[in-house]
Amino acid sequence: MLAIRPLTNESHDDRANVLRIFLESPWYIQLVEGRSPSAEDVEDFFYGKPDGKDAADKSVFGFYVGSEMVGCADVIRAYPTDDCAWIGLLFFAEACQRRGHGTSALALINAMALEWGYRRLQLAAISTNPGGMAFWRHEGFEDIRRTTNHRFTGEVIVMERPIT
């Protein structure tokens, strides 16, 4: 069974586990940014946030099977609107993918966002990650707009679904 736990940047173990997740799935960063994962990805995971958002609006989580962290996520509260929670990243180690963990993690995030009082979940998927696009669509997310960002190798597709 998948469990969710908050992570902190101050924890050496949390930082090491997040880096391990990135390094165990180098294809993800390669697909969406055209480079290899690095320690800067850990910094971005813990501190990256949209302009105008406070650090207090960002929460980072680890997903665990037993004592092993198998994935991580970050969620921004009240972004881009007051009734919405934004999933900045939902990511699992390659060896732990295709086991239902993504669906379970999304259900945990959905329940948390509902408890926080939000009505919608949004995220940005990158067109050069077809597996990710398929996952989000399978989970009921629909495209609401497309844009570009020089950081990413493909088109940025903003997706949304209601919180149920």
Predicted regions and their residues:
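Residue-level signal for beta-strand positions within conserved beta-sheet cores that form or flank
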Residues: 83, 119, 155
